[in-house]
Amino acid sequence: MAQGQRKFQARKPAKSKTAATASEKNRGPRKGGRVIAPKKARVVQQQKLKKNLEVGIRKKIEHDVVMKASSSLPKRLALLKAPAKKKGAAAATSSKTPS
């Protein structure tokens, strides 16, 4: 058996763009609901406001829960951040060290 790993891995040839789009069309219907974006400016503005309110409310609730949990625990609560969605990013580390 050879020592170490091969320098260049064998790869499949890349699909052409037309073949890739054709395979996407042949995949069939996708799961989940679809939201059709509104065309009227007022409705767009209302949806944007609604989304921002929902996000704000959710963040406030999460913050309150964390504060309540950390105040009732004898030692400090360690929060972990979700990993970034960038390619090649290292694993996420917590901003506070768990003890």
UniProtKB/Swiss-Prot annotation:
Residue ranges, compositional bias (Basic residues): 28-37
Q: A Pfam family in this protein?
A: DUF2462
Region (Disordered) location: 1-37
Xref: InterPro entries: UPF0390 (IPR019034)
Family classification: Belongs to the UPF0390 family.
Q: What does this protein do?
A: May have a potential role in hypercalcemia of malignancy.
Matches recorded under PANTHER family: LEYDIG CELL TUMOR 10 KDA PROTEIN HOMOLOG (PTHR16967:SF1)
What's the protein called, per UniProt?
A: Leydig cell tumor 10 kDa protein homolog
